Structure formats: C-alpha cells, structure tokens
Amino acid sequence: MAYFSQQLINAVTLGAIYGLIAIGYTMVYGIIGMINFAHGEVFMIGAFISLIGFMICSTLGISSAPVAILLVLLMAMAFTAVYGWTIERTAYRPLRGSFKLAPLISAIGMSILLQNYVQLAQGARPKPAGSIIEGGYTLFSTDGFDVRVAWLQIIIVVVTVVLMAGFSWIIAATPLGRQQRACEQDMKMAALLGVDVDRTISLTFVMGAALAAVAGMMFLMYYGVVDFFIGFLAGLKAFTAAVLGGIGSLPGAMLGGLLIGLIEVFWAAYFSSEYKDVAAFSILVLVLIFRPTGLLGKPEIEKV
C-alpha cells in the first residue's frame, strides 16, 4: 500500500507536467485543426531558459526561492511566447489555406530546426540544474516505508490546477476566449463578424507556448537536468495525452496527461522501466483504433 501510494503521488506529478504541455497542443488544434509539432521544442526551450534564469539569479545573489522561481517563470514565459508567435508567423500563417500536409511538414521542419539550434548553442550533454526546492512532508509510514510528498510536487500540482482553471476561464468568459471559440466554429464567419483571426490565432500560440514554459520549468526543477532532446519525447507523450483525452478539449488534455503519467510510472514501478515508453505509446494506438475522438472529445460533424 505504501509503495502504491508513493507511485501514485509521483504519477500525478508527472501527469500534471504532461497535461500542461498537452493543453498547448489542444488549444492550437481546436482553432486551426492542425497539430503544432514544434510545441515539444518550445517546452524544451522553456526548460533551458529556466536553467539560464536560475543561473542569473544565483549570480545576482537572489537566494529567496519563491522570488527566484517567480522571476524565472516570467522570464521563461516571455521568451517562449516570442517563440510561439514566431512559429505561428513563419511556419503556419504563410501556409494557411494550402493542402493540409504543408503546415505539418513545416512544423516538423521547425521542430528539427529548434532542436539543432539548441544543441549547437548549449551542447549535446545534459545540463544539471541542482536542487531548487528541497524537503517534503511525510504522509504516513508503514512496514518501514515512508510515503512522502515533496514540496515541489505540491507546487507542480497546485500551479497546474491554477493554470488549468485560469485558462478555462479565459476561454469561457473573456473576449479573447469568445473570439477563439468563434474561430473554432467557423473561421471565415468569425472574420466576417469582425474577429481579427490572425491576432486570435497568434495569441493562441503565445498562450500555448507560455504553458509549455511553465511545464519546462517544472520539469527542470523536478528532474534537475535538461538536454536538447527532452522536447521530442515529452512532446510525443503530451500529444498522446491530448489525443487520449480528446484533442480540442482542455479538461481532456489534463485527463490524458494524468493517465499517461499513471501508465508510465506504474509500468516502470511494477513491470519494467525499459518498456514504459512502449506502454505509453501503445495507448495512443489503442485510442486511435477504438475511440478516435478520445475520452472527452466530440465527434466531428462534416458539412456537405
């Protein structure tokens, strides 16, 4: 029971990180019907910017962890927002209206470009970050085994819940959210009604990139290391989470992230850590076969 409980805590933490990345995928898909396959690299860049930010805070003598985290978070979100806007402006907008494979190929090319750019700039070796927040709370002990939740795990889950609620409110109750929903329903009609479609899509990419930055910083703090390749695997798992939950649905993206986290952690804990990725991606195949719209997704209605 103690071992199971500890793995459950670890799984929820990892699932929260995947869920934050998955929301970026699902927001973009919900409006333009395309997958931003460079989103994983934005997450990776957010982690690297966070690493640089923590190094700057250390150099400036900022020893307060909350202050350093807040400053680094704002810095990472600002930088990745620029990357998100640039990706939309260069890889998607010029190809809007072309055949559907064109933006997909362009996004994959952008992903490879960003990955190699970071590799050349930061090197291929993993970069350690050290411990940012230490300590935790022991929930209970049994059979000589302590079930602990780290303060960082609590922070990750709380931040994820707050951001999930905040973005849901933005989409449901703000002018930008109404414009996003209008573009999702019918982009041409939204433009005729006065919605600035280009601006709305760009802001959606910016919002998704900012969430990826938060996930990148949480990943860096949780695992204490970052390299140029983390965006590829984490991005694929987050995409799997978005499809599993129902791509286009924010609650579905978070649910999918939690499920992927549970599958990955419990498979590694009870079976083999070597095949945890196989187990996670097998879920994608099964979902596409038996429920293509995902757990919370709505079936698409084609107009004729």
Explain the meaning of each model-derived region:
Residues 4-54, 86-102, 244-250:
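Single transmembrane alpha-helix segments in multi-pass membrane proteins
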